[in-house]
Amino acid sequence: MTHATDYATWRAAAREHDRLSGGTDWRELDESPDYDYRLIRERLNELRALRRHGDIARLVYSLHEGLHGNLGNIANPVLYSHCLFGTKRLLTEYLDEVAATLDDLCDQDFPDFPLAAKLRFFERTGQSFGRSALMLSGGATLGLFHSGVIKALWT
C-alpha cells in the first residue's frame, strides 16, 4: 500500500489486507461492544420503511431526532481502527441511508413538506453538525505544498 500510486490501487490493497487479516469478517457482523448496533439497526429499518411508505412528516421527525454526531456511539474511533478500508457494514448502510434520505428530501417536492419547512429542517440539521473547514497553516513557506493539497482534494 505504501507503493500505491493512486487511490484505486491503495483501496484494492487495503481490501485485500482486510480480507487476509479477518477485518472483512469483522465488518460483516453487526454485533460489537463498541457501539449500540441494535439501535442503529432499528433506526436503519425505520428510515427505510418511512421512506418506502412516503411518510414525510414521520421521516423528518425521525431524522431530526437521530441526527446528532454520535448516535449509538457510531463515532467511536475503535470502530474505524479494525480495518484499513471501512468499518462495520451496518454503519455504512445506516449512513448511506441517512444521506440518501436527506438527498431525497432536498431534491424532491412534497405537498406536505413545503419549501419553508424544508429550509428550517436543513438549517436545524446544519446546526446539529456544525460546519467543516479546511485550515492550512504555515504561511508562504508551505504555500506550494498547500496548492498541491487543494488540487488533490479538488480532483
Regions found by a protein language model. Give the residues of each.
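Patatin-like phospholipase
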Residues: 1-155
